[in-house]
């Protein structure tokens, strides 16, 4: 690891579970790269994601957004395609875009939205979009006829969270330049949503561990029992 990482790591006590306020101060202080580092949240949950009734997923609009310009692909036709273009979609199309993705392995976008009538066509992409977390889904509001609202929400800083195979949720909560206060606001809104999404089938401790880190910096552990303090 580089000199910056080593210096940053000295500021963090690995055995300490910090409050969210302390953690946001530390993650900003230990972000020393010469670019605006992204701040990531990792939450390990007490669920078994192999069971359908222990899935945790959803979407929430972060009060301060993510600081990232999000490219959106919309599968729609006719009036809905025009609506998507007017609302600022980066790419709009139908079968021709499905072919482009299949033939060219084209993934130059961050979010995919589809109108329900297009899902028969988009379904053919399940194998390629699914593993990348790009498959449109009604639960996260990305399968909808209200494409303008979906686009506005995404551009306003809507993030999707989803537990992975190892029972961890990884989400971006902002940039170093946001400063501790805005990062804390985003963190709390997201943690509140994750707590409310607890499956009834999940037994025992739900929040196993919570940590934040910058792109090039060390992780900072947060006390799971005080995430909303």
Swiss-Prot record:
SUPFAM superfamilies: Ribosomal protein L1 (SSF56808). GO terms for cellular component: large ribosomal subunit. One of its GO terms (biological process) is translation. InterPro entries: Ribosom_uL1_bac-type, Ribosomal_uL1, Ribosomal_uL1-like, Ribosomal_uL1/biogenesis, Ribosomal_uL1_3-a/b-sand, Ribosomal_uL1_CS. GO terms for molecular function: rRNA binding; structural constituent of ribosome; tRNA binding. Keywords: Repressor, Ribonucleoprotein, Ribosomal protein, RNA-binding, rRNA-binding, Translation regulation, tRNA-binding. Part of the 50S ribosomal subunit. Belongs to the universal ribosomal protein uL1 family. Binds directly to 23S rRNA. The L1 stalk is quite mobile in the ribosome, and is involved in E site tRNA release. This is Large ribosomal subunit protein uL1.
